[in-house]
Amino acid sequence: MTVIDIHTHAYTRKYLEILREQGGDYGLKIRPDGFEEIFKGETPVAFPQPGHFDYDIRIRQMDDTAIDMSIVSLTCPNVYWGGKKTSIMAAQESNNAMAEAQTAYPDRLRWFTSLPWEYPDAAIEELERSCAIGAVGVMVLANVAGRSLTDSFFAPIWQEIDRRKLPVLLHPTDPPGAIVMDMGEFDLSWAVGFMFDTTLAVTRMIFTGFFDQYPDLKLIASHGGATLPYLVGRFEKGDEVELPQRRKMQQKPTDYLRHIYYDCITYDQAALDYLISVVGAEQVMFGTDWPHQVFDTQGAFNHTQALQAGTCRAIRSGNAQRVFEL
């Protein structure tokens, strides 16, 4: 059975050096175990692993776990730091490396472009350049340096993505307020803050009518949609009592939840089963979060294997083949 991993990450050594030298609030610190980790202030953001940098390691891991294709993306903190010149440079460094990796392994790798979202003209230029060298989608964090993705400032970028009908992987990062809420303790930013970040971003998109504005947008909500599936009843009740004068959606909240896509990274069989019951199996794709410490390749295989055969095939590859036109 073909397997396509749509949620897997990469860095380059040069990207980390740019971050180290020009990262602003972001930087690298030594952990108690002696390894380097990316922090924002005192809040852990990401822990680079050897597999983030080495595509030979990646291909061996894919071979060992029977993954046929990976669609790779830059992860947190992406390129929303350092000013315009630095943001563009970091995006191009990451995107060029992924394009080169795809050239080296054309049957095994595809990639999401990262864009300097804080500078829309530059972001659109990089989007055009990235698509020309092989990008099959766009990676965006759930907030751009604290700014909502529905901010009209980003409209030119969304219009171009929508025009191109590109899949967008919406991935969480440290949410606004993470420092005030002391989410650095016990890695609460990852465990809870990331889920809040995704949930708030997509909920705002739903209630502002964002998906009506961009009807061809193929959005993928990371980590099984965070808490979105669990809140479906609350969304419906909120819509029921909303004043008609303030309502911006053209459909019901559940309709939008069934319009967007999700990966299967839930770490729990019952959570995946519930996600499918809410949004439908045709909206869910295979993901592992490799090579982060919290990757769950075995869980992704086990949880999809437990589903009906047709559902398993759709999630492991069929849906991704349709969404990414592979």
What are these regions (language model features)?
Residues 68-202:
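Active-site gating/metal-coordination segments in enzymes
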Residues 1-6, 11-69, 96-104, 125-129, ...:
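Mid-to-C-terminal alpha-helical segments outside catalytic/metal-binding sites
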Residues 4-6, 70-72, 110-113, 138-140, ...:
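Hydrophobic faces of well-ordered beta-strands that scaffold small-molecule active sites
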Residues 140, 187-199, 213, 219-220, ...:
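Active-site core of metal-dependent hydrolases
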Residues 206-255:
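Aromatic-lined glycan-binding groove of carbohydrate-active enzymes
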Residues 11-13, 78-80, 118-119, 146, ...:
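Active-site environment of divalent metal-dependent phosphoester hydrolases
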Residues 97-104, 129, 133, 156, ...:
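Alpha-helical structural signal in soluble globular domains
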